[in-house]
Amino acid sequence: MTGTVLQVSTSRGGIPKRALLSAELTAAGVVGDAWRYPFHGGPRKAILLVTSEGIEELVAQGFTLFAGALGENLTTRGLDRRTMYFGQRFRVGHATIELTLMRTPCATLDVYGGGIQAAMYDALVQAGDPASPVWGLSGFYASVIEPGTVSPGDEVALITPPSRRRRR
């Protein structure tokens, strides 16, 4: 599975995040990025990755979204959210990340339209079941395994075997 980095984003806290020309990914997250609440971030939530295809699905449902709107650090093109799962490692530009957790959407996202939380997160997602039709729409948290620079246009390549790993 391969894709492309569409946008790298940061903010001083909250949403939306704004596009950068490039960014350094570290174990602590994207250099210069900040979180609004202390329960955001940390080594297992260093990066939030959202697919542009997922954003487009939500836009088709009437939500006013764009790259960075969901608070993601990495917006990708060409990755199938339905086949992504925890434990997968991806080479992203010069960095390596590992998917760790599904993002649980909060009321902050309601600014983009009522019902957005339900449109991207259901009981199956909460249980870690990729059979959910909304699997991955809320985004995947990732830890940074190998720090490095990432820029729009960089390749995103799966580097772990395609077998399923345990869900968290």
Locate the predicted segments by residue.
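Metal-cofactor-dependent catalytic cores
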Residues: 1-168
